[in-house]
Every structure is written in structure tokens, then in C-alpha cells.
Amino acid sequence: AKDVRFGADVRALMLQGVDVLADA
């Protein structure tokens, strides 16, 4: 469960990063 939570957090950060790059 911990690994899944971590994976979800990383995925969210990646998606957020993509949004930031798209806005840049």
C-alpha cells in the first residue's frame, strides 16, 4: 500500500510538472 501511495504521489508530481512546462 505504501508503494502504491508513493507511486500515486510521484505520478501527481509528474502531471503537475507537465502542467508547469506547458504553461511556461
Swiss-Prot record:
The GO terms describing molecular function are:
ATP binding
Carries keyword Nucleotide-binding?
yes
The entry's keywords: ATP-binding, Chaperone, Mitochondrion, Nucleotide-binding
At the top level, the lineage of the source is Eukaryota
Q: Where in the cell is it found?
A: Mitochondrion
This protein's GO cellular component annotations are:
mitochondrion
**Membrane-spanning ranges:** none
Which tissues is it found in, per the record? Testis.
Q: Which family does it belong to?
A: Belongs to the chaperonin (HSP60) family.
Subunit record text: Forms a single seven-member ring complex, in tight association with the p63 protein.
Summary of the function given for this chain in its UniProt record:
Implicated in mitochondrial protein import and macromolecular assembly. May facilitate the correct folding of imported proteins. May also prevent misfolding and promote the refolding and proper assembly of unfolded polypeptides generated under stress conditions in the mitochondrial matrix.
Q: What else is known?
A: Shows ATPase activity.
This protein is called 60 kDa chaperonin, mitochondrial
Organism expressing this protein natively: Heliothis virescens
